[in-house]
Amino acid sequence: MAHNVFCARYKQEMEGLDEPPFDSDFGHKIYNNVSKRAWGEWIEHQKMLLNEYRLQPWTPQAQEFLVEQMNQYFFGEGAQLPKEYVPPSPR
């Protein structure tokens, strides 16, 4: 059965994730408040952050940074783009 949520990013009822993305209070907050669509968009944004900041995701510092950015992306005013980020040109 589909899990629906009122998506924090889109401010509307949407299909939710199949399971919490990680086992923590924050993971359950995402599960209960973030849609599949918004989560997929976060994954793409996270890839950009990893590449632009050359983060090593296994380090505690990178993990803290990504959780902070994720919190801003979904529940704050939106995650900031790196100052020198240039979006890829359309093909």
From Swiss-Prot:
Covalent S-S links between cysteines: none
Highest taxon in the source lineage: Bacteria
Gene Ontology biological process terms from the UniProt entry: cellular response to oxidative stress
Transmembrane segments: none
Gene Ontology annotations for the cellular component aspect, listed alphabetically: cytosol
Pfam families given in the database record: Iron_traffic
UniProt-recorded Gene Ontology molecular function terms: iron ion binding
InterPro entries: Fe_traffick_prot_YggX (IPR007457), Fe_traffick_prot_YggX_sf (IPR036766)
Protein keywords: Iron
HAMAP family per UniProt: Fe_traffic_YggX
Homology family: Belongs to the Fe(2+)-trafficking protein family.
Function: Could be a mediator in iron transactions between iron acquisition and iron-requiring processes, such as synthesis and/or repair of Fe-S clusters in biosynthetic enzymes.
Protein name: Probable Fe(2+)-trafficking protein
Native organism: Acidobacterium capsulatum (strain ATCC 51196 / DSM 11244 / BCRC 80197 / JCM 7670 / NBRC 15755 / NCIMB 13165 / 161)
